[in-house]
Amino acid sequence: NFIFGILLAWILTRYQFPMKRFVDGLIELPFALPTAVAGISLTTLYSDKGWIGSIFSKWDIKISYTKTGITIAMIFIGIPFVVRSIQPVLEKLDLQYEEAAEVMGASRFCIFRRIVLPEILPAALAGFGLAFARSIGEYGSVVFIAGNIPYETQITPLIIMNKLEQFNYSAATSIALVMLIFAFIILFSINLLQSLISRIANG
């Protein structure tokens, strides 16, 4: 989400191309779709007989019911948070600094690393934190494409649901508590890093 979000925000902000507004609007799709609909749609698209999955199946690459499918679902539901966090920062960024650096002989990579990245990094981390918070407890959009294969594609929310259905409340509570602690540590670390980077950037 972090890398794809930065790349997509950069393309939407810095380049003009046909149907740009349509593509920009598609970013909001995960917010509008019910999670179950998103999960069923992704599973259909990436199954061996789906539009996208059938292409990969020719090379014996399976996407649905694998960890790759879970990753794709996580990216789908999380990338809008990263893109929408970065876009306003890129739009407000003064292009004169980049143009001046280019005139002085700096490479595009150097310009991005020294000028653009320090500006967008706090926003990117904030977006990543939101995407992570959404993904860690996601159920509907992931459960279908995951397939719930034991020890391979079982997702934590589904394990909790299974434990509850078995009336094993202590196990469900323990797993949920571990998830809660893990999420808190990750989000706290992201916020701490974001604060540190902002402080360094502001001198």
Give the location of each predicted region.
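Transmembrane-helix boundary motif in ABC transporter permease subunits
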Residues: 1-27, 40, 44, 54, ...
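Generic alpha-helical transmembrane segments of integral inner-membrane proteins
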Residues: 2-7, 33, 124, 128, ...
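Membrane-helix interface segments
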Residues: 15-23, 51-52, 66, 96, ...
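C-terminal transmembrane helix and the adjacent membrane-cytosol boundary/short C-terminal tail
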Residues: 19, 80, 87-102, 111, ...
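Membrane-interfacial helix termini and adjacent extracytoplasmic/periplasmic loops
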Residues: 19-20, 39-75, 109, 145-149
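Transmembrane alpha-helices
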Residues: 29, 76-78, 82-90, 94, ...
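Transmembrane alpha-helices and adjacent helix-loop boundaries
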Residues: 32-39
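Interhelical loop and adjacent transmembrane-helix boundary motif
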Residues: 139-189
